[in-house]
Each structure stands twice: as structure tokens, then as C-alpha cells.
């Protein structure tokens, strides 16, 4: 598993990325990942409280919190996104997950175009549970069409400012490739997924069959959220997972 690091306190491995999230997580041997979705989005502070209670009631340490799916009112500016992330990681630091530099927790954060929450909120979260014989389980973080790196989002974005069918195909192809790269870091592929999610307000049908389906990303179907990525002028995002259980609370 080249390019991954162990987070033994939580029972998972992760792909190191940026301070606000990792590139993805996979359960360590002897563990599995369980996903919990809230029926309605919960504001960040309330959501963290519910997550804490749920994990403790399951008999797991808070360090088992390995992924979350957030919803925000509207795309952030770059400065606004950083300010939000600096608030978000405070709880992770209190829980023993974030050491001030390395963050092992996977994440997606998108902005529903219809009926958005009034403030950043929890949609779902995942945590590890003990499991002797579970199939590989994992959560790959959301990725939009911006390359990782130190430059601004504008400089890193594929076909910045373009939303033509050709530009969206190129954006989608890049994001699919990034999903595949992250899956590969755990020696996994689309065949191991139990769910794939797309977040865009644009028509993906022109490249649905020959990109998403052909590459195997829709083997368990495709969940399309009519939502935007979390930073302004990004147009297309995906994430995927392979988990052993999913609950709605």
C-alpha cells in the first residue's frame, strides 16, 4: 500500500493529503468501516455531538472517526474555505485525530443547489468497528477538478471557467482518474466499491456511458447529488466508498 500511512489509534490507514482531510481511508485488518447518515443535515457543532455519542455508544474510541460528508450553504472563496477548515479541524484535534499537520480523516463537503442548509452541516459520517472477517472497506474523499498542489484553485483547475460538454468531459475524466489513483493506493479498484457519488449541477449524460460506466465507476449504480463542489468556480466532484454497513439515524 504505497503512499498510505497507518493510523493505528483508529484502526485504519489513510492517504496523506492536506491539513483539512486525507485522500481516503481503509480499514486495517481486524476492522471494518460503518457509515451512518443523518435523515436531515445537522449543523457542525450539533453534528459532532451526535457523532461523539454514536461512536461512544458503539464502544469505540473517538479516534475511530475516519470520514465525514458535509453540506454547506454555498461555495466558499478560497479564503473562506480555509477559515472554515481551521474551525473544522479543532474538534479533530481534541479527539486525537489531527496533530496540527497531518489529518487522517477522509471528507467530502458539497453545496446543494436546492434546499441548502443554513450553515455547514453533517450529512453522514463513517467510523471503524471491530470485524474479524470483513471484506475490504474504505472511503475515498471527495475530489473536484483541481489538481493537488500549492497554487491557487484557479491555477490548478482543469478547464477553469468552462462548462461546455467537452470541458465537463475533461473535468470528469480527471476526477475519475483521481478516484482510481486513490483506490489504487489501497490496492483497490471500482470492483471493490459499494457506492459512487457525483456532485454537479451540469449535465453528465454526454460522458456518463463512455467515461463513468465504461471505467466501472457505476457498478453499484451512481448517486447524483444536484450540488456544487465547496469552492467557487469548481464544477464537478466525486467520491466513492466500499463499506460493510450503512445506517440512517
Identify the function of each model-found stretch.
Residues 1-249:
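Short, polar/acidic, helix-capping and beta-turn segments at strand->helix junctions
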Amino acid at each position: 500500500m504505497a503512499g498510505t500511512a497507518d493510523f493505528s489509534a483508529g484502526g485504519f490507514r489513510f492517504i496523506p493529503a492536506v491539513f483539512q482531510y486525507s485522500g481516503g481511508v481503509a480499514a486495517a485488518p481486524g476492522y471494518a468501516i460503518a457509515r451512518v447518515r443523518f435523515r436531515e443535515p445537522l449543523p457542525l457543532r450539533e453534528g459532532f455531538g451526535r457523532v461523539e455519542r454514536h461512536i461512544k455508544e458503539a464502544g469505540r474510541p473517538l479516534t475511530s472517526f475516519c470520514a465525514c460528508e458535509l453540506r454547506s450553504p454555498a461555495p466558499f472563496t478560497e479564503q473562506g474555505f480555509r477559515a472554515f477548515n481551521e474551525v473544522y479541524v479543532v474538534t479533530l484535534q481534541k479527539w486525537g485525530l489531527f496533530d496540527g499537520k497531518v489529518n487522517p480523516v477522509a471528507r467530502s463537503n458539497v453545496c446543494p443547489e436546492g434546499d441548502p442548509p443554513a450553515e455547514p452541516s453533517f450529512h453522514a459520517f463513517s467510523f471503524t468497528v471491530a470485524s474479524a472477517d470483513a471484506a475490504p472497506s474504505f472511503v475515498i474523499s471527495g475530489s473536484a477538478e483541481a489538481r493537488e498542489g500549492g497554487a491557487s484553485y484557479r491555477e490548478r483547475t482543469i478547464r477553469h471557467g468552462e462548462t461546455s460538454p467537452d470541458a465537463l468531459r475533461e473535468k470528469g475524466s480527471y476526477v475519475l482518474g483521481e478516484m482510481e489513483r486513490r483506490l489504487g493506493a489501497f490496492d483497490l479498484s471500482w470492483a471493490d466499491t459499494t457506492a459512487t457519488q457525483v456532485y454537479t449541477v451540469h449535465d453528465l449524460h454526454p460522458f456518463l456511458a463512455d467515461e463513468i460506466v465504461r471505467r466501472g465507476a457505476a457498478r453499484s449504480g451512481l448517486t447524483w447529488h444536484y450540488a456544487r463542489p465547496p469552492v467557487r468556480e469548481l464544477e464537478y466532484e466525486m467520491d466513492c466508498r466500499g463499506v460493510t454497513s450503512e445506517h440512517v439515524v
